[in-house]
Amino acid sequence: MGWRTVLISGRAKLDLKLNNLVIRKEEIVKIHIPEIAVLIIDSTMVSFTTALIEKLIAEKVKIIFCGKDHNTIGEIVNYYNKHNSPLMIRKQISWENNAKQKVCQEITKEKINRQAKLLEFIGNENANLLQEYKSQVQVGDVTNREGHAAKVYFNSLFGKNFSRSQDNPTNAMLNFGYSILLSIFTREITSSGYLTQLGIFHENQFNYYNLSSDLMEPLRPMIDNIVYFYEPEKFEKEEKIAILKIMDEEVFVGKTRYTLLNAVNEYCKSVFLALEKGEEQLIKFIDYEL
């Protein structure tokens, strides 16, 4: 799989030549397709050939489209990702409920842990409160520690008047970052032969990416960290580039250093193994420096 993220903005024509993505603008740029992990189309003035799309899909390149407001509006999902996908889906359906609940508990605890570490990093005293919430997470999160932690966390980062429902550059940048994470996880899940629709916690019948939403939770603070220090006053190309730099981040799984894409692969494999064996301690979470 590739590792590069390519962002296309403005007027452009894209086509295929000798296994290269050819970008025709004022100048012509060629990028070797096997190097590409994600292609983001951030313009309604981009045209491309079906031969290119076919090749990108075959190489498992995630193609994401943005609307006029520069927010992501959709992506292309490959129908056929792994030769034994029917077997993997049967395994997915047979994951025991107890195993799913225990895995969800660990994911929720790790998400709150990462939120607490970010608050500690910026010197916010509410980091200790979030660590308390983490220790109180029960199976099924029946006391909604995740929700309580989120309220304290976002108010600590962006102010007491901040709400995730507001239409502002901060939320736009957060949403874009989360959508990139979602696409990374969707790419990994489908490449492993599983269905993104069948979540282990998220069960929204209208959400095509329930499982992706479940697994990405501990990495959301990576995006929050970028947005907090960027303090966006607008949401345009520069802000997107700042978010996309996470693709080049070096992170850790255990003591081994990985790029983010490879780390997501290791993390997802460990979650699937934990679900299959019913042993939540097998999960290998991603660690990263702030």
Regions found by a protein language model. Give the residues of each.
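Active-site helix-to-loop segments that bind/position phosphate- or nucleotide-bearing substrates
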Residues: 2-12, 26, 58, 70-290
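Glycine/small-residue-rich interface belts in oligomeric ring/scaffold proteins
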Residues: 35-84
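N-terminal ordered "arm"
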Residues: 8-50, 54-55
